[in-house]
Amino acid sequence: MKRNVLLLPLLIFLLIAAALLWQLARNAQGDDPTNLESALTGKPVPAFRLESLETPGQYYQAEVLTQGKPVLLNVWATWCPTCRAEHQYLNRLAAQGIRVVGLNYKDDRAKAVAWLKELGNPYALSLSDSDGMLGLDLGVYGAPETFLIDGRGIIRYRHAGDLNARVWESELKPLWDRYSREAAQ
């Protein structure tokens, strides 16, 4: 009896270790947790009322994302090192006429405004989600994340991680072109 009690912690440890190794092997084979599809894909952007990041007291609602043309909703924060890495590419997309709306997520307003002044502002509009409620409604679990929203306000794609040239060309641009054509008809 005493021996069985002593073996129980070892057995539990071995089971946990096996489960961890199994998950690591899955990730190595391409089961990337950042590729999880959003539960909101194919559904309208959740209703919201958020303050402008740069103009305190000015509020926007979800309709700002439903202006007949596609838009990228980029979730970012100054505390996010990957957001800094993707920022230059977002500036390039904006310079090409891609409409990007920024959602500053759980961040300090003054730091965020200073960040945009320092690194450039790719956002046609910057919204402040200081309490993270819209992020929660969108299923955001970190920053950066980027959502492609069609001209009717339907979420068509979610990308977790930095938006770079490879991701844009292979994943987002084909969808952007498709929904841009649909909006033009």
Swiss-Prot record:
Pfam families (UniProt xref): Redoxin (PF08534)
Record topology, Cytoplasmic segments: 1-4
MF GO annotations: disulfide oxidoreductase activity
SUPFAM superfamilies according to UniProt: Thioredoxin-like
Keywords: Cell inner membrane, Cell membrane, Cytochrome c-type biogenesis, Disulfide bond, Membrane, Redox-active center, Transmembrane, Transmembrane helix
Organism: Salmonella typhi
Subcellular location: Cell inner membrane
Any Gene Ontology CC annotation: plasma membrane
Membrane topology, from the record: Single-pass membrane protein
Membrane-crossing segments per the record: 5-25
Function description: Involved in disulfide bond formation. Catalyzes a late, reductive step in the assembly of periplasmic c-type cytochromes, probably the reduction of disulfide bonds of the apocytochrome c to allow covalent linkage with the heme. Possible subunit of a heme lyase.
Disulfide bonds: C80-C83
Protein known as: Thiol:disulfide interchange protein DsbE
Residue span, Thioredoxin domain: 39-177
Gene: dsbE1
Primary residence: membrane
